[in-house]
């Protein structure tokens, strides 16, 4: 490529990707699959004395509706569908195992086979819920890792069906709700992640969906990943979660003419 490349002509091809998504009212029924934007970056580097190399980088971004969170239309729709299919799966499994005398291992194998076939179809066929991205290379020991995860998942399904066959549905689901305790323990032992206790309203509401996560708490922070625990809240002050409580105390002290507590250095 010659060095007389017209950079103004290339800059005209760059779509405007700096626009911020506009806010929505709660329970607004917009696009169920999010907003997508593409950003094209052109960079020119000197590859030699008489030749220039033009590098084109295309970045595709999915904008998450962080302003509404769980109250967005898409989140509510998926949550409703998840509750419905979970309810149907649970009681159909109990019906097949208890009344029809089904075998847990065979039922688990059929479910895993169906999941594998449907997952392959969803990966290969274009679908609105998933867009496959080609890989140039795979991580080391990728097949062995996936095989190990598949075997563990099969064992989890079969053991869950065995327990569902021998005990009541309510007791089986109560025991399953304590699974996050072991998740926290394993993540602490293997990954070194630290999990704490909830400290604000949003995280307490999240715990109501799975009571087992509350029992796994051991400090004032919430049992959520660090990226969510230290992220900026969708409402209120634009401060991390750990700074919101001192900021609230500071405002109360100002309104009551009390000695102001010291705020942590930002």
UniProtKB/Swiss-Prot annotation:
One of its GO terms (molecular function) is antiporter activity. The keyword Transmembrane helix applies. Residues 1-28, 196-241 are annotated as: Disordered. InterPro entries: Sugar_P_trans_dom (IPR004853), TPT_transporter (IPR050186). Pfam families: TPT. GO terms for biological process: transmembrane transport. GO terms for cellular component: Golgi apparatus; membrane. It is a multi-pass membrane protein. Belongs to the TPT transporter family. SLC35E subfamily. This is Solute carrier family 35 member E2A. The lineage of its organism: Eukaryota, Metazoa, Chordata, Craniata, Vertebrata. The gene is SLC35E2A.
């Amino acid at each position: 490529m010659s060095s007389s490349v017209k950079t103004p002509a290339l800059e005209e091809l760059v779509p405007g990707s700096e626009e911020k998504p506009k806010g929505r009212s709660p329970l607004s029924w917009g696009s169920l699959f999010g907003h997508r934007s593409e950003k094209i970056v052109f960079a020119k580097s000197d590859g030699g004395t008489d030749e220039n190399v033009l590098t084109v980088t295309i970045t595709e971004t999915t904008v998450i509706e962080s302003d509404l969170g769980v109250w967005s239309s898409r989140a509510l729709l998926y949550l409703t569908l998840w509750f419905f299919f979970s309810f149907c799966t649970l009681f159909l499994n109990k019906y097949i195992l208890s009344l029809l005398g089904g075998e847990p291992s065979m039922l688990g194998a059929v479910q895993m086979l169906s999941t594998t076939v449907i997952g392959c179809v969803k990966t290969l066929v274009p679908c609105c819920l998933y867009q496959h991205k080609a890989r140039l290379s795979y991580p080391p020991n990728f097949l062995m890792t996936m095989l190990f995860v598949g075997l563990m998942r099969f064992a989890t399904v079969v053991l869950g069906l065995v327990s569902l066959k021998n005990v009541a549905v309510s007791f089986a689901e109560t025991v399953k709700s304590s699974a996050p305790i072991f998740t926290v323990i394993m993540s602490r032992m293997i990954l070194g992640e630290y999990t704490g206790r909830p400290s604000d309203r949003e995280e307490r509401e999240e715990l109501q969906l799975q009571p087992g996560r509350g029992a796994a708490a051991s400090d004032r922070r919430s049992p959520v990943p660090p990226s969510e625990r230290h992220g900026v809240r969708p409402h209120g002050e634009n401060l991390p979660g750990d700074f919101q409580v001192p900021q609230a105390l500071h405002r109360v002290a100002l309104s009551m003419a009390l000695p102001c507590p010291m705020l942590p250095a930002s």
